[in-house]
Amino acid sequence: IDGGIAESGSYTLTKRTAVKNTPSDTAPVEFYLEAGDKINFDLKVTQDGHSWISYISYSGVRRYVQVD
């Protein structure tokens, strides 16, 4: 995992999208967010040839969502 870019913003999903605890194609899916859901992210990461945004969940766990 690269160190990521400390960048923040909000992103609205255009399709049902997996949420993972690590930014990896092979990481298990923790749950799904639906099209139209908005993510307030605080980090961007490039891993496995993909771009991921990341946020800290209400439970304190860092989550990753692939955005490309």
Positions of predicted regions on the chain:
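SH3-family beta-barrel domains
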Residues: I1-N21, Y32-A35, L43-V45
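Short alpha-helix capping/helix-loop boundary micro-motifs
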Residues: P23-P28
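SH3/SH3-like beta-barrel superfamily modules
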Residues: E30-D68
